[in-house]
Amino acid sequence: MKRLLTLLTLALLLLTLGTTAAQESCTAILGCDPTLRGLPDEVMAAYPEPNVIQLPIDDSLIYDRLYRKVTAPTQVFDAPGGSPISDHGGGFSYVTVNSIAGDWTQIDTNQWIPSNVLSDDVLISRYAGIRLPAEPLPYPVAWIMRHLNPAAEPGADPSDFNPFLYRYTKVNLYTYVEIDGFRWYQIGPEQWVHQFNVAKMTPIQRPAEVETHKWVGIDLYEQTLIAYEGETPVFATLISSGLEKWPTNEGLFNVYLRFERTTMSGAFQQEDFYSLQEVPWTMYFDGDIALHGTYWHDGFGYRHSHGCVNMSITDAHWLYDWSRDELDRSVPDDKDLSVYVYSSGQYNP
């Protein structure tokens, strides 16, 4: 009997310790349950999905050009079967298809390359960001970053009983608990995801140094961008910033040069050579670092670039059009869109 009482006492002590840990990490939003169950179902049912407006997809904008990857070094000719005029070094290179004549592809005026060094047409991302309501959102909004089934409880394996969520699905983050130093977010009744599986949108206060009415905040940790009018967030999306070798610099900048289409290239005769024709909706803000549309990948939410801030074509067009009236050239020393780059957490590559 004495041994049984000892075991019962030990079990109760362990349960108390576990509950205490949950109480400390639970955010207690609208009655969070500290037993790792999260918010009551009826509370989440009042806000079953984010109250945001999906940016519409304009196929005529996305597919107005054909892009192909250059898969091997080649020469550029002045006509199909004509004379070589330059070398194309391969590397990370994409071109615009202007026309096709037999086994030749025109990539610019009087510039042709053999079609056999080109990939099939590039599949352009149809991802797009969200417009935000005037009133504050009741819960943080996030995007699911990989296809998954949520776990039934924090720290558990994916549950086949939960719905399958596709990458880029938008979810509310109702609350969280911390396990082993990492957050597990509740996104629905008995639905939990690890913090590495979401990209969270968190509006910030306007930095005192921002002088323009319209500005954007770029969070390198979450890989998100939020556009603001004054203090009010109006738009949010996923981006891809620079890789560790080519980081996007933190700080406050202003757009100083805009192009609806421009060619980007660099690292000539090096392993990381790149050449990208007709990069859409480009806004330079920090030397040769720019915000721009991206037709060559669909990896938004992850670092991917040589320093630029990659956006989907839909998002880049929206941002370019929304901010084009910020600079008043009739006003001396007026400034274009402010770009505030920061990190909300510590990135560990």
Tell what function each PLM region has.
Residues 23, 209-211, 235, 243, ...:
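Exported/periplasmic cell-wall-interacting domains
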Residues 8-16:
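Bacterial N-terminal signal peptides
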Residues 78, 129-174:
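Short, solvent-exposed interaction modules
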Residues 1-8:
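Bacterial N-terminal signal peptides that target proteins for export
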Residues 157-249:
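Cell wall/extracellular polymer interaction/catalysis modules
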Residues 87-90, 163, 223, 314-321:
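Solvent-exposed, polar/charged alpha-helical surfaces in well-ordered, non-transmembrane soluble domains
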Residues 24-32, 82-119, 163-199:
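SH3/SH3-like beta-barrel superfamily modules
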Residues 23-64, 108-142, 186-215:
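Boundary regions of SH3-family modules and the immediately adjacent low-complexity/disordered segments
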